[in-house]
Amino acid sequence: MNYHDLEHLHPPFPELGEEVEIRLETAAKEGLLLFERDGELHEKPMEPWEGGLRARVPVHASPFRYVFRLPEGFWGSHGLEKTLPRYDRFFHLLAKPLPPEWALGAVFYQIFPDRFRQGRPELVPRDGAWLYGGKPIRKKAWNEPPGEEGAREFYGGDLWGVLEALPYLEALGVEALYLTPIFQSPSSHRYDTEDYGRVDPHLGGEEALRALYGALEARGMRLILDGVFNHVGATHPWFQKALKDPTSPERGMFTFYPDGAYASFWGVKHMPKLDYASALTQERFILGKEAPVRRWMRLAHGWRLDVAHSLGEGGTNRKNARWLRALARAAKEERADALVFGELSYDAVPTLRAHTLDGAMHYAGFAHPVMAWLSGRDLHGNPVALEAEEAWRTLLDHYQALPLQLRHSMYTLLSSHDIPRALWRLRGDKERFKTAYALLFAFPGSPALYYGDEVGLSRPNPYEVWRGDPYCRAPFPWDEALWDQDLLRFFRRLVRLKKTYPVLRLGGLLPLKAPTGVLAFRRRLGGREVLAYFAKEGARLAVPRGLDLLREEEVAGEVAARYLLLEPLE
């Protein structure tokens, strides 16, 4: 069998121009490394090593594209092909800047600040304190379910509350927090920023952020902020100047049309879209010392870029890769170990292969196929008949297409503030919910928990209303009597395994033969393996003698299970 993954690159995170040893595990005795340079394919003879073949080449470009020529054919990212593969089926290697080591396989926890925990009640906005969308905002009681007013509803969670919750998060095993936007905004979701230089006073202001950052640093934990750099809020002074004065310098920061209309996020008029063709936009968001992407790296460890796939010029995503790359480089100039990943809601591969970001929210390559398989419905509630084998092929295809260095920094999720919660989509089926999360933690990438999933937080609306926002943004239930303690124990075990088993954190992904209806794969690193099996309804599995990592017991022969992570003992 042929096998090539990140562990076969030495060094795995090279500088541009640095020589890299590229290895292939294979039974073949001879082969060539073919790599693309300046539009031509070049050959490098491979020499034997104890596990197969190897060759040394300088990384002249990023991405550096290559494929192996063996006696039986060409071995590329998607396996063996008899004829030369397309370039998109070559392996893609990137040179620095690359994801920081701390982020590889790290366990993330997403927090929607207004709904997580209230630390200082005096910070909660008063009922009707201002108008949003022409209507007064609403102060809601913590135990009230979210309603149709959505962004107008304030529960009063703040950064002091997040600080208070750190012992809970540390006990869970979380390594990094991702906070949805924290900068001043008139809405509770804060995706319509009106001041990038000011942490929202209703969240505790910069004082609370500094305290939170310091406490996280002391615990060895990281903080990721949400960078809303595709658009601003309509109340932002820059947009107000542009709107009122066509001769103002700010006018060029936005795209106005002859009829007076302007480009906005999804046509939502209170979120006018930035134009990165503007020198002023570039100065204020990328180049300037006080550009938010730079300034806040003094109090955080990275960014999640909102609607990263849409950012660009002229009211479009033109030159998207260029500007994503520039934002990421700016953050890393301020903090060398910064992590910058994007909300790439669809196929993330083309953007990531262009050496732009450190990773992406793994919707298309993980969350959507897994939840479609286990729930029988797609993201929008439409029936889907997806079999385990089909789901596996989708997962593997996306994994194989990723640049090797980004396979372990994908923000891998099942629930978020934008999509229905996983437990709700599974209609409260706790065993399928466990199966989904066991799969998430067994899969390559950085597993991400959405606040409350670990205690069984779901949502109140009926299934006739199949929607994420606002129902997926319910407040965290801090009354422990409301927690599903069995789920919480299960999540703590999953987190512990991800953190303590290098093969689960950094291992490659390989197929594993399994019965019909079972999604199965192997993780492999340095000759060690974990076998992973998942079945929607449960299955009888024939397994070698090994340690069941979740149940912490030895098994062998025939085993009945919905999910099984097995470390072979033979």
Regions found by a protein language model. Name each.
Residues 2-13, 20, 24, 30, ...:
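Active-site and adjacent substrate-binding regions of carbohydrate-active enzymes
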Residues 33-37:
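Conserved aromatic beta-strand anchor motif in extracellular beta-sandwich/beta-rich domains
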Residues 58-63:
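Surface-exposed, short loops/turns at beta-strand junctions within beta-sandwich domains
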